[in-house]
Structure formats: C-alpha cells, structure tokens
Design a protein with these regions (language model features):
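Active-site nucleophile and cofactor-binding loops and adjacent substrate-binding regions
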Residues: 1-5, 24-26
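Glycine-rich loop(s) and the adjacent beta-strand/alpha-helix scaffold that form part
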Residues: 7-9
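Conserved phosphate- and dinucleotide-binding cores of soluble alpha/beta proteins
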Residues: 11-12, 18-208
C-alpha cells in the first residue's frame, strides 16, 4: 500500500498495479478525488488513527519507505521541520515525526534556500532525531546515515553522487558562506513534543 496525500502519480501507480491500495489522508489534485470516488482500493483514513502513536490503527511504522521534507538537517542527521534557519516558526509538525518510524526515511532538501545553507552544524530546532533519518538527497549530492551500513553497501558501486553529510555542509558553506548564529531571548514561544509527549526542544523568541 501507499500512504497519501494522493495525486495523479500515486493514482497511476495504483491503477498500473504497482501498489494495491492507497490509504489516503488528503487529496492534492482532481485525479486523487476521481480515484477516491471510483476505486474501492483508494481508502480514506484519518490522521488521528493512522499517525497516532497511541492508536491501534497506527500504520506509519509499517511503511517501507517514506519521503518527507525538512527546513534544516545537521551533520548528525537531526532534522528541523518547524522553524526556518532564521528561528521563526513556520507551521505545525503534523504527522511528520510519526512517519520517521518507517523502515527507510528519505529527506529530499535543497542544499541551500535564499543563500542560507540547509545542511548545518546543528539544527535550529530539533524535531526528528538523526537515528531515525536515513538518507538526505540534495541537488548536489546524497548523504546516507553511517548507521545504515546496509544502504551504504548496496549503493557502493553505483553511479549515485554519494557524499558524507559533512561534505554536503562544506559545499553549502563554500557557496553561501557560514551562516551567522541567531540571537534568541529567554522567552519560550513553543515546545516541541515527541510522539509520546516527551518535550525534546523548545522554540525561543528571536531577538529583534
């Protein structure tokens, strides 16, 4: 099965027999809407069950591969999805953390945004621990978490542009320069909870 948000590409995969079911939480285009209307195997699901760590319907950890976004990744493969590199809040985390329990987690990210490196020494806000993030894909190369020796072995003799995460960070800094550190006040404006409710980081107010 594939977990949606669905779009025409996911629908085509199901209709061509590449996946048997789409378990959908939202549709991103009219092809997804059409498929949900016409295909019995295109099933509506609620994120309150499918992504809920405490729910019997939670299937996020059953997924073989998940592809997610991130605003920052650091050299320890920790990821940020809730603030930008300027320290300001972007949006909520949603089911992003729950998806990290998939067998392989891939984060496709640009190496930099608006001349600001995305691969950094330390993320501004910790949302996902590096031990759950397996592959970083950028337009200038791919980094595989050293803990995933199986993936490193399988890609050893491939033509893929594989680098260490440190090499990607250095590439970003050679183009953009090393970013200045943000000045924060002591005021806490948000808490970052892990899926079990544990607070793993906080967001502090940016000094004007």
């Amino acid at each position: 099965f594939a977990r949606g948000g669905s779009n025409k590409y996911l629908v085509e995969m199901m209709e061509e027999g590449l996946v048997e079911y789409i378990l959908d939480g939202q549709t991103f285009d009219l092809e997804g809407v059409r498929s949900m209307r016409e295909n019995a195997n295109h099933v509506w699901t609620s994120p309150f069950t499918s992504y809920n760590y405490h729910s019997k319907g939670n299937f996020a950890g059953l997924v073989d591969v998940v592809v997610l976004g991130a605003t920052e990744v650091d050299v320890n493969f920790n990821a940020n999805v809730v603030t930008h590199s300027d320290g300001y809040l972007l949006h909520g985390i949603g089911g992003w953390q729950n998806c990290l329990f998939a067998k392989t987690t891939i984060l496709p990210i640009p190496l930099f945004r608006d001349r600001i490196p995305v691969v950094v020494d330390e993320v501004t806000t910790l949302c996902g621990p590096g031990e759950l993030i397996d592959v970083i894909v950028t337009e200038r190369g791919i980094a595989i978490n050293p803990k995933r020796t199986d993936l490193i072995e399988k890609t050893k003799n491939s033509d893929l542009p594989i680098y260490s995460i440190e090499e990607l960070k250095e590439e970003a800094e050679s183009i953009c320069g090393k970013p200045q550190k943000i000045s924060f006040s002591d005021e806490v404006v948000a808490a970052i909870n892990w899926v079990d409710g544990t607070v793993i980081d906080v967001v502090r107010k940016v000094k004007e």
